[in-house]
Amino acid sequence: MNRTDELRTARIESLVTPAELALRYPVTPGVATHVTDSRRRIEKILNGEDKRLLVIIGPCSIHDLTAAMEYATRLQSLRNQYQSRLEIVMRTYFEKPRTVVGWKGLISDPDLNGSYRVNHGLELARKLLLQVNELGVPTATEFLDMVTGQFIADLISWGAIGARTTESQIHREMASALSCPVGFKNGTDGNTRIAVDAIRAARASHMFLSPDKNGQMTIYQTSGNPYGHIIMRGGKKPNYHADDIAAACDTLHEFDLPEHLVVDFSHGNCQKQHRRQLEVCEDICQQIRNGSTEIAGIMAESFLREGTQKIVGGQPLTYGQSITDPCLGWEDTERLVEKLAFAVDTRF
């Protein structure tokens, strides 16, 4: 009989289950309290109950755990310094959506060489998240793959659905199940309505199929996530200006949704020129000083060293520098965070 299935499968490998990985790297009571408390604080900011600003900042992607931990340690100092004005959360992105092809992140390819040791990547991701949370720094990530979230979601305080997947039904269903607040980016063309539709969908109950923590295929029914919000990330042109934010809030109001959102300083808003994140910051700070309460949070891409680098076989990587989108360096990071804190002073 002719084969009709698995005709294009080149490799099959057993995968550790989420439950097995959690036994190796268990959540401690202290970390569980930290994650729970961080989520509650973020929810209050998104609901307008807390006047502070949510600041989600960090490398475009994680590729080096040592550099990531150094960044987290420095970020914790900024958290302590500005905790009365800012809720600082570290970007810990392990999955990268690609327009065509490219490195897909630490979980898929931790060795950066196409060997795709996914089991090792999942282990590294969970290990790092535990260490960062143990420092007292909340973590944020993009939920891209429908399965890998099962391995790390218990350690995440804030999640994102990216511009390429906000319109996806299965990602909206996944967001409805997540235990953390979830931001939906506007589309790559700048369309914010798809993000509003995603928020509405994620607030509803859904049923979908997914493996559970033990790897058993399961029918999940969700209760819905009430903490969805827009991430203004720009598109063909920036959309961080006051009129753009007002227009997005008008759409939220139309559907009786909270009129609070997050502005991404990078991506379409900086037109892929990383230093322009500082210009976006200046504009947002002025909007806050002018009395804007709609801006609940911001996102920015920064690392220890400015810029980006290519992966070249046989050549060492520059420590603390991004291998995906270019990032601000640490000195600019400190200035950016300081400016945000001073702007938020006017809310008190």
Curated annotation (Swiss-Prot):
Source taxon at top rank: Bacteria
Signal peptide residues on this chain, from the entry's feature table: none
Keyword Transferase: yes
GO BP annotations listed: amino acid biosynthetic process; aromatic amino acid family biosynthetic process; chorismate biosynthetic process
GO molecular function, one term: 3-deoxy-7-phosphoheptulonate synthase activity
Enzyme Commission (EC) number: 2.5.1.54
InterPro entries in alphabetical order: Aldolase_TIM (IPR013785), DAHP1/KDSA (IPR006218), DAHP_synth_1 (IPR006219)
Catalytic activity: D-erythrose 4-phosphate + phosphoenolpyruvate + H2O = 7-phospho-2-dehydro-3-deoxy-D-arabino-heptonate + phosphate
GO-annotated cellular components: cytoplasm
Keywords assigned: Amino-acid biosynthesis, Aromatic amino acid biosynthesis, Transferase
Keyword Transferase attached: yes
Pathway listed: Metabolic intermediate biosynthesis; chorismate biosynthesis; chorismate from D-erythrose 4-phosphate and phosphoenolpyruvate: step 1/7
Stored SUPFAM superfamilies: Aldolase
Function: Stereospecific condensation of phosphoenolpyruvate (PEP) and D-erythrose-4-phosphate (E4P) giving rise to 3-deoxy-D-arabino-heptulosonate-7-phosphate (DAHP).
Family stated for the protein in its record: Belongs to the class-I DAHP synthase family.
The protein's name in its UniProt record: Phospho-2-dehydro-3-deoxyheptonate aldolase, Trp-sensitive
Organism, as annotated: Shigella flexneri
Name of encoding gene: aroH
